[in-house]
From Swiss-Prot:
Protein name: Putative GPI-anchor transamidase
Organism: Caenorhabditis elegans
Signal peptide (UniProt feature, chain positions): 1-16
Gene Ontology MF terms in the entry: GPI-anchor transamidase activity
Keyword Protease: yes
InterPro entries documented for this protein: GPI_transamidase, Peptidase_C13
GO cellular component labels: GPI-anchor transamidase complex
Gene: pigk-1
Lineage of origin: Eukaryota, Metazoa, Ecdysozoa, Nematoda, Chromadorea
Length: 319
């Protein structure tokens, strides 16, 4: 009888612990990121000078994720239009996302696919890893089952498609097929898909692969809008959704240890700012987005701390 009472007391004590701090620790463990590396595929699908903003969309986001630790080796950037060298550009060799901003096209920018290289086929090949054997490593998405992958698409779109080069279309079925192939080949751990175009929510309608969180700048029946026009060059320089994305990352995610979560990011561009209703699909994403850090997708998997003071290594260190 005494042993029975001891066992009963132990069970009660265990339940009490589970309902307090221990349970919180267990919950935190399940939300701990399981990835070891981060990758990004940033795609501007539009050609022509008047689509200047789609190039600056990609470049602005590129600089944000590089600031948060994702290296060029883990970023595949595709620009369908060579805006910096366009003869209409009054500031040759530059791209700006704001009238009083900084040049986004500096010497530290690495473009992997440009101009006519940016096609539906090349994009699908990047995702699936099915390249010609001579394709260099810099043009390959070398992900594995522990990779968190950010896919960002910007350009012109319609119901169930995005235009590439104004001559062909990437359909939502094409995108879903590529992501499913990635899942079957263990090419990602978790994925964030962002489509910034008109009617962009239609692009994730067919995605059924697990661990994929999908976002869009507009719903299927809505347009997506530009943000700022530069009268000196006569075109819009960034889209609203990307502007508020970069603004959020700049102000709220200043370092890799930021506590900003994905719900904060989703809420960063309400309809009063974006002028359209942003789309979210999370039925294939098992985690609570309030408990997923923004840096799980927009930053490096490793936290770096920059030191400003001088460090002197004495003889004992080298012994």
């Amino acid at each position: 009888m005494r042993h029975v009472l001891l066992i009963f007391c132990a069970i009660i004590a265990t339940e009490a612990l589970l309902n307090t701090g221990l349970q919180l620790k267990i919950d935190e463990l399940f939300d701990t990121p399981g990835h070891t590396n981060n990758w990004a595929v940033l795609v501007c699908t539009s050609k022509f000078w008047f689509n200047y903003r789609h190039v600056s969309n990609v470049l602005a986001l590129y600089h944000s994720i590089k600031r948060l630790g994702i290296p060029d080796s883990n970023i595949i950037m595709m620009l369908a239009e060579d805006v910096p060298c366009n003869s209409r550009n009054p500031r040759p060799g530059t791209v700006y996302a704001a009238r009083a901003g900084t040049n986004l096209y500096g010497s530290d920018v690495e473009v992997d696919y440009r101009g006519e290289e940016v096609t539906v086929e090349s994009f699908i090949r990047v995702l699936t890893g099915r390249h010609h054997p001579a394709t260099p490593r810099s043009k390959r998405l070398l992900t594995d089952h522990q990779s968190n992958v950010l896919i960002y698409l910007t350009g012109h779109g319609g119901d169930s498609f995005m235009k590439f080069q104004d001559s062909e279309e990437l359909t939502n079925v094409d995108l879903a097929y590529a992501i499913q192939t990635m899942f079957e080949d263990n090419r990602y751990h978790e994925m964030l898909v962002i489509a910034d175009s008109c009617r962009s929510a239609s692009m994730y309608e067919w995605i059924d692969s697990p661990n994929v969180l999908s976002l869009s700048s507009s719903l299927t029946h809505e347009e997506s809008y530009s943000y700022d026009v530069d009268t000196d060059i006569g075109v819009y320089v960034i889209d609203r959704y990307t502007h508020y994305t970069v603004n959020f990352l700049t102000k709220e995610v200043k370092a890799l240890n930021s506590s900003a979560n994905m719900q904060d990011y989703i809420d960063s561009c309400p309809a009063r700012k974006c002028l359209s209703n942003t789309g979210v699909r999370k039925d294939h994403y098992p985690k609570d987005v309030k408990r997923v850090r923004v840096t799980d997708f927009f930053g490096s998997s490793r936290i770096f701390q920059h030191l400003s003071e001088e460090i002197v290594l004495d003889d004992e260190f080298w012994a």
